[in-house]
Amino acid sequence: MPEVTLTTLNGLKAKGEKITMLTCYDATFAKAASEAGVEVLLVGDSLGMVLQGHDSTLPVSNDDMAYHTASVKRGNNGALILTDLPFMAHATPELAFTNAAQLMRAGAHMVKIEGAAWLAETIRLLAERGVPVCAHMGLTPQTVNVLGGYKVQGRQEAQARQMRADAIALEQAGAAMLLLECVPSELAAEITQAVGIPVIGIGAGSATDGQVLVLHDMLGLSLSGRVPKFVKNFMAGQPDIQSALAAYVEAVKTVSFPASEHGFSA
């Protein structure tokens, strides 16, 4: 696959072509996913749950993220590598820069930070210092204890209005991409239209500029046995993992995934 850059992703949004993203934590799957055409490999702090066996992402350290980012880099064949800043790694703007620098040195092309408009100062600092940022909004797993669980965000009009305003504010602060998780499909569509940067969805309907799933979820693997509504098992009916990855890419590109049953209403 030709090397994917931010320019590539912005071009896909401009053309109306969907962007494909999957989580990835090691060299073998990085090679498989990138060769299947997955454009963005997300080294997610979800590794705390699917690899380390924790019940949340909170125990994950920045050293963990750097280790797995370096592993993904070694197997990657052209995809853009996006790495999460884990819990409290961006407690202050300067701390965020220090931790982001570690991840960029490990091989990340961009970092992802969970939050809302209060992230503006941090995003501005990172962008000015050459670190592209993806802002993660909606259901933010690092704040699951504040949210009261893994719940859809933005169903109330006041919350939806604030989320739209926050998205615009973060773009103005320098965010290069947005990720919306567990947001009503209509709200996600409105935010996607309101900003000029690519918007990736997970449980956010089909109108976003692209889609992401946790690798283990889309392969039908689960420690808990609980399958989120927005997940589809792409291993079903496929002879091997490479075929499942290719099926995911095709489904996102042709907008056959996500279907209406994978989204949420207001």
Curated annotation (Swiss-Prot):
Broad EC category: transferase
State where the protein is found. Answer: Cytoplasm
Give the Enzyme Commission number.
2.1.2.11
Where's the active site on this chain? E181 (proton acceptor)
Pathway terms, separated by semicolons? Cofactor biosynthesis; (R)-pantothenate biosynthesis; (R)-pantoate from 3-methyl-2-oxobutanoate: step 1/2
Asked if the Swiss-Prot or TrEMBL record annotates the protein with the keyword Repressor, the reply is no
Report a single Gene Ontology molecular function.
3-methyl-2-oxobutanoate hydroxymethyltransferase activity
Pull one GO CC term from this UniProt entry. Answer: cytoplasm
One of its Pfam families is Pantoate_transf
List, separated by semicolons, the cofactors it needs: Mg(2+)
Q: Which residues bind Mg(2+)?
A: D45, D84, E114
Write down how the cofactor binds this protein. Binds 1 Mg(2+) ion per subunit.
One of the GO biological process terms: pantothenate biosynthetic process
Any idea which UniProt keywords this protein has? Cytoplasm, Magnesium, Metal-binding, Pantothenate biosynthesis, Transferase
Coarsely, its chief localization is: cytoplasm
Q: Which InterPro entries match?
A: Pantoate_hydroxy_MeTrfase, Pyrv/PenolPyrv_kinase-like_dom, Pyrv_kinase-like_dom_sf
Similarity field: Belongs to the PanB family.
| NCBIfam families named among the record's database cross-references | panB, PRK00311.1
The record describes the protein's role as: Catalyzes the reversible reaction in which hydroxymethyl group from 5,10-methylenetetrahydrofolate is transferred onto alpha-ketoisovalerate to form ketopantoate.
State how it assembles: Homodecamer; pentamer of dimers.
Q: What protein am I looking at? A: 3-methyl-2-oxobutanoate hydroxymethyltransferase 2
